[in-house]
Structure formats: structure tokens, C-alpha cells
Curated annotation (Swiss-Prot):
This is 1-(5-phosphoribosyl)-5-[(5-phosphoribosylamino)methylideneamino] imidazole-4-carboxamide isomerase. Its main location: cytoplasm. Its EC number is 5.3.1.16. Pathway: Amino-acid biosynthesis; L-histidine biosynthesis; L-histidine from 5-phospho-alpha-D-ribose 1-diphosphate: step 4/9. Belongs to the HisA/HisF family. InterPro entries: Aldolase_TIM, His_biosynth, HisA_bact_arch, Isoase_HisA-like, Isoase_HisA-like_bact, RibuloseP-bd_barrel. It is an enzyme of class 5 (isomerase). It comes from Rhodopseudomonas palustris (strain HaA2). GO terms for biological process: L-histidine biosynthetic process; L-tryptophan biosynthetic process. The gene is hisA. The keyword Kinase does not apply. HAMAP family: HisA. The lineage of its organism: Bacteria, Pseudomonadati, Pseudomonadota, Alphaproteobacteria, Hyphomicrobiales. The keyword Amino-acid biosynthesis applies.
């Protein structure tokens, strides 16, 4: 089970949004590279990065910040935001990104996901961000008419490494992860699922480690780490103890 600390990039800075709204962004660190180093020093083993500007623009917009982070941390980094074609997938993987996350294109162009997953086994994840049960696209600005499960099922045999499932209604609000919806998705598919959106406290980490969540790969922590509601040492100690058990 992995706890992924999140770095969301907007204008080269490390921010957190509320419910995916770019107008409701809080800057937590002007230097994302320093933030990445801090997470590494705290003992995290896998970093989750999102290029928010890229998600809206449909192409990478914070490449310089991402590349700077890759130079200072040795842990694997997964990256989403603005990855809409195979050339971008290939470019990021060649620069040292461990795993790319395809979101909007997974809805609009499922063939891209299948092609990328086939070309780069184990290095392509799908990001499914749901609002009222339906998947949102274009940096969450638009809602589709399909559910997360419907899209996830399209990729069952495609070699997708993970599904990152976000409940937009909870994202950035510290209301706790929507475990019921996340676990229901994980139980309905064979692809590992990563929980995202609203992780609020150590209670969410305990929920992630509970027997009913055994099909998950882990969860993403954002605002709770930045504002001190989640103690990294306590969270990582719990995960370590669960691993050793």
C-alpha cells in the first residue's frame, strides 16, 4: 500500500485547488522542487504530480518545474495533466517519469491509452475524476455522460498499470476520501485503484489499510499534508507496520 504525496503545479508553483476550481487555488510552496525534496526527506516512496495548467491547455505547461523535480528526487514520480498524445507520453517517460496518467484522453481517445499501455508496459495509468458519478474532462471543466466504471472496464485487458479515482466533490476540502465509491470500483475491475480526493487525516490512512480496501494500490494525500492535519511520520509508520504484519 502506497501513500502518494501530491504536488499540483500552477504557474510553476505548488498549489492545492478546491473541487478542481482554478479560481480557488491556495499556494503552498513557491518552489515545487523544494517541496519534492521535503517529501523525499520525510520518507515517501512515490510522488504524484499534476500539471494543472496542462490539464486545461491540453499540453504540458509546467515542464520546467517537473524536470527540476526529477533532478532532485530518486523516488519514482507519476505525472498527469495535459498528456493527450503518444509523443507526450514518450517524451515524459524518456525524461524519467516513472508513470504517466492519462485523463481526458482516456475518455475522448481510448485507443491512445491502449496503444500507450502496450508500448510502455506498467508505465501508463488512467485518471478518472468523477462528479456526481460521471467522469469529468478538460481539467474537470466539462462533465461526460459516462461513469468511472464504464471507462475503467474499457481498459481491463489493455495493460493499464493503475486507475486513479478522484471524487471531485471532496477534492481539496478535507472531507475524507469517498471510500465506498472507490472500493466499489476496485472490486469491480482487475486494475489496481488509487484513491484520491479529500484525504483528511490519519483515519483515511487507517481506512486505506483496512481489509475491505485490500484491492487498492494506495491513496493520494494533498492538502492534509500541507496544512499539518496528517503527520507524515505517523502515516508512514502505520503503513510500514501493516506491510510487516
Amino acid at each position: 500500500m502506497i501513500l502518494f504525496p501530491a504536488i499540483d503545479l500552477k504557474n510553476g508553483q505548488c498549489v492545492r485547488l478546491e473541487q478542481g476550481d482554478m479560481a480557488r487555488a491556495t499556494v503552498f510552496n513557491l518552489d515545487p522542487t523544494a517541496q519534492a525534496k521535503s517529501f523525499a526527506a520525510q520518507g515517501f516512496q512515490y510522488l504524484h504530480v499534476v500539471d494543472l495548467d496542462g490539464a486545461f491547455a491540453g499540453k504540458p505547461m509546467n515542464a520546467q518545474a517537473v524536470e527540476s523535480m526529477l533532478k532532485v528526487v530518486s523516488m519514482p514520480v507519476q505525472l498527469g495533466g495535459g498528456i493527450r498524445d503518444l509523443a507526450t507520453v514518450e517524451a515524459w517517460l524518456s525524461k524519467g517519469i516513472a508513470r504517466v496518467i492519462i485523463g481526458t484522453a482516456a475518455v475522448r481517445d481510448p485507443a491512445l491509452v491502449k496503444q500507450a499501455a502496450k508500448s510502455f508496459p506498467g508505465r501508463v495509468a488512467v485518471g478518472l475524476d468523477a462528479r456526481d458519478g460521471k467522469v469529468a474532462v478538460e481539467g474537470w471543466a466539462e462533465s461526460s455522460q459516462v461513469t468511472a466504471l464504464e471507462i475503467a472496464q474499457r481498459f481491463e485487458d489493455a495493460g493499464v498499470a493503475a486507475i486513479i479515482f478522484t471524487d471531485i466533490a471532496r477534492d481539496g476540502l478535507l472531507k475524507g476520501i469517498n471510500w465506498d465509491a472507490t472500493i466499489a470500483l476496485a472490486e469491480a475491475i482487475s486494475i489496481p485503484v488509487i484513491a484520491s480526493g479529500g484525504l483528511a487525516s490519519i483515519e483515511d490512512v487507517k481506512a486505506m489499510l483496512s481489509p475491505r480496501a485490500h484491492k487498492l494500490e494506495g491513496a493520494i494525500a494533498g492538502r492534509a499534508l500541507y496544512d499539518g492535519r496528517l503527520d507524515p511520520a505517523e502515516a508512514l509508520a502505520l503503513i510500514g507496520a501493516a506491510r510487516a504484519a
